[in-house]
Amino acid sequence: ELVKPLPDNSEYYVSIESLGSQPKEDYELLELHIEKSLDKNIIEDAVMAKTEKELQQIWKIREDVAILASKAKFDQHFDISIPISLIGKIINSIILELESISEVKTIFPFGHIADGNIHFIIGRDIDDPVIIDKINSIVYSPLKKHKGSLSAEHGIGLHKKEYLQTSRSKEEIKLMEQIKIM
């Protein structure tokens, strides 16, 4: 069963897991940082797991994100990496452009803030190659300008091959092709 630890009215959510050699002291230190962040309005709300069960409930949200994210008939999954300092700006610009496509029904970004790896699940109500290409172009277009990557974790594959030049030079692509032949 999915338990929501916080109200679902925020624009962004962040999960932090910390592991140290002194669990009690580490927990208190994280709690202090969260309190300071709340006091300075850096964050709006927070919840800390106090038991293993609560921790597993929070992780279940992340693990089931694909199921939760797409309420549309068709969806597209993306796995890009972008500079950490630009995560908010790039995600917001992608969302803004995607919202202009009437066939897009859900836009769900999530990922790993610490390494700039962002996933998008974008739901649409029709399976139209023109719309698919338009969505691909919107998601991949910031990568070249900001030195991002087309695939952070899951490889290029056939679906991303035509967009590889958005994050790799001709020389890099040629080298990748030569390595693949080996």
Q: What are the residue ranges of the model-derived segments?
A:
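Noncatalytic alpha-helical scaffold of FAD-dependent oxidoreductases
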Residues: E1-M182
